[in-house]
Regions:
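RNase H-like nuclease fold core
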Residues: 1-57, 64-66, 143-154
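RNase H catalytic domain
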Residues: 11-17, 60-141, 145
């Protein structure tokens, strides 16, 4: 049996400030018959961004990195914003013309649409919540990579 497991993360140092630095990262594992076959880790840096934008970009880029959309995919997220947004809130936003529960425009609409588009390309996808900084190996790995990206001077 084939399965892909993926973790994504996003962060921003100076979130809410005019000048800040942020990044997203994702980590993928490809398993066949309970044997780890291949891994991939990637990410990128951004300036003048937010935590939520980077969390969304991490998940989007994770989904884009997978060529075979028919393989079962488990996406592990420590971001409740992305997890609840893509599994619950988005249905209401679509029905309500992209207004949130306070009747305000949904933030990051274009990224949500891109994430939904990428999600819908998969035949078997599950989003799973993990607690950040709790020792969960995949989450720790992607968090380390994310911080390394933000620490890099280029």
């Amino acid at each position: 049996m084939e399965i892909i497991k993926g973790w994504s993360d996003g962060g921003c140092r100076g979130n809410g400030k005019e000048e800040n630095i942020g990044a997203y990262a994702f980590y993928l594992e490809y398993w066949v018959d309970n044997k780890l076959i291949h891994t991939k880790i990637d990410g990128d840096i951004s300036y003048t961004t937010t935590n939520n934008v980077e969390e969304l970009k991490g998940c989007i880029e994770l989904l884009k990195a997978i060529k075979d959309k028919s393989i079962k995919l488990e996406v592990y997220l420590d971001s409740a914003y992305v997890l609840i947004g893509i599994t619950q809130w988005i249905n209401g936003w679509l029905k309500n013309g992209w207004k949130n529960s306070k009747k305000q425009d949904v933030a990051n609409k274009e990224l949500w649409l891109e994430l939904l588009n990428e999600k819908n390309k998969f035949s078997d996808i599950e989003f799973i919540k993990v607690k950040g900084h709790s020792g969960e190996v995949g989450n720790e790995k992607v968090d380390e990579w994310l911080n390394a990206i933000m620490d890099t001077p280029f």
